[in-house]
Structures are given as structure tokens and as C-alpha cells.
Amino acid sequence: MAYKCNRLRVLGAKIETTAGTAEAITASEATVPVFNLTYTENTTYTRRENVSGGKLKGRRGPLIAQMSFDVEAMGLGSSGDPAWATTFLPPCGFVGSTGVYTYTRVYANQKTLTLKSFIDGQYRLIHGAAGAVRLTYNAGGISYFNFTFTGIA
């Protein structure tokens, strides 16, 4: 059995210009190292019963997927916003300017992401993704932002 290297990965991410439309991701958008990247598909299958005895094929439900990962809580060491903050915080409901991000429950022009990664040799992409973030503090250690994004597979 092959060893799963899931500790440190690079995830490509780009904010979409039109919500729900996948963006082309290049190497310049895949510069943020992430930890503990997981991908889960939540696709359902509906089995259909036919009263007259015929055969009706079942239907696949919506192609929904979720990506979760951790990012170290760190800045640039100079003025400006780090790449992970400008990319991952707006789709979680945060509006930022000059290094200050404020959570807004509902706002017009909600940002969405296209996320792309290779996991165990398989290409994974979700688009139209929005999510949630949680900050985990470790006393005397490294703090992490835990992101979870749900989108279209």
C-alpha cells in the first residue's frame, strides 16, 4: 500500500470573477502551503421505483464537494496582506482593507473560489466554493486557520 503524504501540500486557489464559474489556475496562484488537505464528495444517488414494472434508471444528485485544510497564521513581516488572507478570507464572509478583515454575515458581491489540488495522484477541483474559517491557537506553538470550503465538483 502506498504511503499517503498528506502533511504539506500546495493548493491552487483563485477568487472567481463570476460566482460559480471555474477559473483557470496557474502556478502563480498555487503558492500557499497548506496542511492536512482533505477532499470529500457529497454526491447522492436517487433510486427510482417504477409502479408499472418497467425499468427506470436512478439519478445522480448534485455534484457537491468539500475541501478542508489548515494554513499557518503568519504575516508577511512587512506591510501588506499575506496571499492566504487575500485569497481565503473573502469567500468566508470577511471584507478586508489594509490588513484589517471584518466579518460580515451577508454582503452583496459575495466572493467564491476555485480550488485545485492533486491528492494521491488524482486531480481535484471545486468551483463556486464558499466556506467557513476557524482560528486554532496553540499555547507556545504554531497557530492555524482551519478552512472548510464547499462547492461544485
Residue spans for each PLM region:
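Signature of extracytoplasmic/envelope-associated structural regions
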Residues: 1-153
